[in-house]
Swiss-Prot record:
Residues 1-7, 74-83, 157-162 are cytoplasmic. Its main location: membrane. Disulfide bonds: none annotated. Pfam families: CASP_dom. NCBIfam families: A_tha_TIGR01569. Keywords: Cell membrane, Membrane, Transmembrane, Transmembrane helix. The lineage of its organism: Eukaryota, Viridiplantae, Streptophyta, Embryophyta, Tracheophyta. The keyword Lipid metabolism does not apply. Homodimer and heterodimers. Residues 29-52, 105-135 are extracellular. InterPro entries: CASP/CASPL, CASP_dom, CASPL. It comes from Oryza sativa subsp. indica (Rice). This is CASP-like protein 1C1-1.
Length: 162
């Protein structure tokens, strides 16, 4: 259907877009911090204080780096190498999904709290932090969409038989 060069270009564009979105998500989350005075006490909110947000940064940074490193591999690799790359991409996609889910759950707690557990919402006090986390989650969602498009395209173009 498409020439080998056209397939390669589409794969590279999808991979670079996914890597870029992952890098943006990681940087936005890493920049998430805010300080306010509440009842005379200084309160800080930083992504480092929540393990799931740290996981989100690490996962997106790893996906971004791995996606760019893969571009250095010659496109004329063996079918076995292509299949191994596909398996690695699937694993990284699952890590991305887990990181987004964990960070999203923490963002929900930050926004609405949990009345059953007695946890108060913090976004009223530290809106800048919550806005940056929300922006990082949007970028993380875009990363997953792009990454899964890349995966589907890789599966579609991978030869079925040895």
């Amino acid at each position: 259907m498409f020439s080998a060069k056209a397939r390669w270009i589409v794969a590279v564009v999808l991979r670079v877009a996914a890597a870029g979105a992952a890098a943006v998500a990681a940087v936005l989350m890493a920049m998430s911090h805010d300080e306010v005075i509440v009842y005379g006490m200084e309160v800080q909110a930083k992504f480092r204080y929540t393990p799931s947000l740290v996981f989100f940064v690490a996962a997106n940074a790893a996906v971004s780096a791995c996606s760019l490193v893969v571009l250095l591999v010659p496109s004329s690799t063996s079918k076995l190498a292509a299949r191994l790359l596909l398996m690695a991409d699937v694993v990284l996609g699952m890590v991305l999904a887990g990181a987004l889910a964990a960070a999203g759950a923490m963002a929900e707690l930050g926004k609405n709290g949990n009345s059953h557990a007695g946890w108060i919402a913090i976004c009223v006090q530290v809106p800048l932090f919550c806005d940056r986390v929300r922006s990082a989650l949007v970028a993380g969602s875009a990363t997953i969409v792009l990454y899964y498009l890349m995966l589907m395209y890789s599966i579609y173009t991978l030869p079925m038989f040895p």
